[in-house]
């Protein structure tokens, strides 16, 4: 049952990340699974015989977080002026493009076969291999993410997100830099999603495109729309 709990914690972490763009900023992102994949494949490439680098776990987390943030900004820039259904369609397409690219880059990602024999996650000599050890790692990360996002929600940036969610034109009219606020939402959300991907890959010690399908993306969105309408506290519950 610990494996089931671990799966739930990963979805909670993903929900916390996606809630930034959907719940706080009111931006319907249907391609969030792409950032999840970026994190997972960052770990898959840097902690396996695939590139034979075998970097330390924490270093990979940092690299994956940066990769996720950059990917989030790259997605955010072309969709800045899109809203509603148009935004949803473009982000959905982005998520599918990432999956298709991963699926077809056999020479790097292993294609449909994925990447196996990933290194064990280890911090300061402590290995996280058994489900109960992964559970504690996930719990710490989820709590940290929840606290950070809660602080952001009550910051000036969080108030800017709320204003954009209520009325983007009015927010711009009162002097809020909506471009910067939106990019910050995408970047922060993508960073958390990417970190979730790293832990997922480390816990499975295997990663493949099948874990990042459209259905997975929709499931994460449903978690936000149904389970966590706006409040971060509901996401944790």
Positions of PLM-derived features:
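Transmembrane alpha-helices and adjacent helix-loop boundaries
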Residues: 1-237
